[in-house]
Amino acid sequence: MGQKIHPTGFRLAVSRNWASRWYASNTQFAGMLKEDIEVREFLKKKLKNASVGRVVIERPAKNARITIYSSRPGVVIGKKGEDIELLKAELQRRMGVPVHVNIEEIRKPEVDAQLIADSITQQLERRIMFRRAMKRAMQNAMRLGAQGIKIMSSGRLNGIEIARTEWYREGRVPLHTLRADIDYGFSEAETTYGIIGVKVWVYKGDHLGRNDAPVVEEPQEERRKRPGRPEGRRREGEGRPGGQRRGAGAGGRRSGGADAKTGE
C-alpha cells in the first residue's frame, strides 16, 4: 500500500496539509480546480530558474492568496520588486480576483524532495551521468539532516535502447508509517533520447503528538548484560577441546582405546 500510493495523498489530514485550501459548491468546484492547475503550470514555466519547491493556493472571500516556496526568493522578486508586481498582475488577470503573493524561503534546498528532483533532471539534460547525479544528491541530503532518502530514475538511462528503472536508497524511508514526515517530489528530464522521470522520497523524522515521546535507542555500552550462570557451574562438554563429552576420546572411543565389540 505505502509503496505504491502517493506519499502526500496517503498522509493528508494526518501529517500533511492540502496544497489548495478553499471551499466551493458542486457547480464551482471543477472550474476552480482547473484554474488552480493552470496557475501552477504557469508558475512552473515562469519561475523555472527560481527553484520553486511548492505553491500553496488559498481563496478567502473573493480573494486569492498564493504562497510560493523558493530557495531563491530574490529571483522571484526581481530588481526593486518589479518581477513580483508583473507576476501579481498576470495572476489577477488569469484568476479574475485580487491576488496577494507571498514568498517563503526554503532554507535547506538539499533536503527538499521537489528541488532535489528538479536538480537531477537539470543535470540529466546537461548529459551528466545519472548515477553520479543521484549519489551526489543523496550525500548532500544525508549530510544536512535527512534521516533517509530514496531516488528512482526511469527511462532510457544513458541512451540505452530498452528503458529501465534504477533506484538508490540511504538511511530509512518508512513509507507505511503515517506519522513519518515523508517529502515527495517528481520531475521529468527532456533528453534527446526521450523523457526520463525522477522520483524522490525524503524522510525527515516523525510527527509526534502531544502525548508521544520520541523513541531514543539506548547506547550499546549502557545496555544491561544478561545475568549469567552462577560461578562454578558449567554445561556438560564445556571446557573440553572440541566440545567432547566425558569419557569420549579421539574417534569417539573410550579412554581405554579398546573396541567394545571386538575386544581389540
UniProtKB/Swiss-Prot annotation:
Domain of life: Bacteria
An example Gene Ontology CC term for this record: cytosolic small ribosomal subunit
Biased composition (Gly residues): 240-255
Ranges of compositional bias, category Basic and acidic residues: 221-239
Molecular function terms from GO: mRNA binding; rRNA binding; structural constituent of ribosome
Domain annotation KH type-2: ranges: 39-107
Region annotation (Disordered) ranges: 211-264
SMART domains in alphabetical order: KH
CDD domains documented for this protein: KH-II_30S_S3
Keyword terms, alphabetized: Ribonucleoprotein, Ribosomal protein, RNA-binding, rRNA-binding
Signal peptide start-end: none
Gene Ontology BP, a term: translation
InterPro entries with a match to the protein in the record: KH_dom, KH_dom-like_a/b, KH_dom_type_2, KH_sf_prok-type, Ribosomal_S3_C_sf, Ribosomal_uS3_bac-typ, Ribosomal_uS3_C, Ribosomal_uS3_CS
Function: Binds the lower part of the 30S subunit head. Binds mRNA in the 70S ribosome, positioning it for translation.
Family designation: Belongs to the universal ribosomal protein uS3 family.
Subunit composition and interactions: Part of the 30S ribosomal subunit. Forms a tight complex with proteins S10 and S14.
Protein name: Small ribosomal subunit protein uS3
Originating species: Ralstonia nicotianae (strain ATCC BAA-1114 / GMI1000) (Ralstonia solanacearum)
Underlying gene: rpsC
